[in-house]
Amino acid sequence: MTELTIDVRGLTKAYGGRRVVDAVDMQVATGRIVGFLGPNGSGKTTSLRMLCGLLTPDAGEGRVLGLDFRREAAAVKRQVGYMTQKFGLYEDLSIRENLDFIARLFSMPDRRAAVDAALQRLGLATRQQQLAGALSGGWKQRLALAACLLHRPRLLLLDEPTAGVDPKARREFWDQIHRLAGEGITVLVSTHYMDEAERCHELVYIAYGSVLARGTAASIVAEAGARDLEDAFVRLVGRANDNFGQAG
């Protein structure tokens, strides 16, 4: 039987009477890379924040990493690495100081060794004294991922991690993601890039807070009767606009 890192049903969140996430079901098998796609404002970030325990859902039940994601949110947070859309570390601290600060937050007894390992893994060791604010987008991305990995999470939730990053840095980032998945770490990643979506094992497409399609890239293209993945999502968005837009 397949082990599920995420097994959640009916995930729901509303603001001002409008459901931004509407009864979303999410099942992600351990060690898989799942792409989370959809237009801006479709509910991706809100869903990720609920799954990692940062935001309380209005409804929904299930488990994340074997824990009740609502009742045991604090325990879930300790085992998840969450990378936000915007760079969230301290720009006036060095690379090493940022990582050391994160390690202290997690009360890691082997703090120095953990920081050294993260620096080596992400190719940051030779730059560790540089201020974070002086880094390019690609190097900031590496630092943010290093911070996510410090406490050895079993699940990574990545919110548009490569937005605004050059193609070479994006490719290197995805090579790293596949290495992590090979080590048994589960990855749920939101993206707008079709080439990145094709590197995922499975995809979930959301619009107006509801899941419109899920499956492999090939199965989604076939079911949509599309030429390629980009064409499939154009068709899905069009249908969503017709159905949900008129209802709104």
Model-predicted regions and their roles:
Residues 92, 131-135:
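Conserved ABC ATPase signature
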Residues 100, 104-127:
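Conserved ABC ATPase "signature" region
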Residues 152:
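Conserved catalytic motifs of ABC-family nucleotide-binding domains
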Residues 156-160:
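Catalytic Walker B motif of ABC-type/P-loop ATPase nucleotide-binding domains
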Residues 214-215:
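ABC ATPase "signature
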